[in-house]
Amino acid sequence: MKTLLLTLVVLTIACLDLGYTKTCFNDDLTNPKTTELCRHSMYFCFKNSWIAGGVERIERGCSLTCPDIKYNGKYIYCCTRDNCNA
């Protein structure tokens, strides 16, 4: 009986996601938008947008830090909620 109980406890722990995993939108031009599961150390979702050759470019994903540098007309947005980088 103890062996069965121990086996059930081990299986339960192995099957549960013991940590919270953030999801962020990724890619740039897919419709509908796709998401990705971020690694444990990734706390931010980001969205970079800029104009190149007269066309708006967008990049989305997970990030360890939030880059706040805006250069060459590049706009960077960071957030901490799931799928907040739409």
From Swiss-Prot:
Question: GO molecular function: any one?
Answer: toxin activity
> Is Hydrolase tagged as a keyword?
no
Q: Please give an example of a GO cellular component term from this record.
A: extracellular region
**UniProt subcellular location:** Secreted
Q: Which UniProt keywords apply?
A: Disulfide bond, Secreted, Signal, Toxin
Q: In which tissues is it expressed?
A: Expressed by the venom gland.
Report the InterPro entries cross-referenced here: Snake_3FTx, Snake_toxin-like_sf, Snake_toxin_con_site, Toxin_cobra-type
- Signal peptide (from-to): 1-21
Q: Give disulfide pairs as residue numbers.
A: 24-45, 38-62, 66-78, 79-84
The similarity annotation says: Belongs to the three-finger toxin family. Short-chain subfamily. Orphan group IX sub-subfamily.
UniProt name for this protein:
Neurotoxin-like protein pMD18-NTL1/2/4/5
- Provide the species name: Bungarus multicinctus (Many-banded krait)
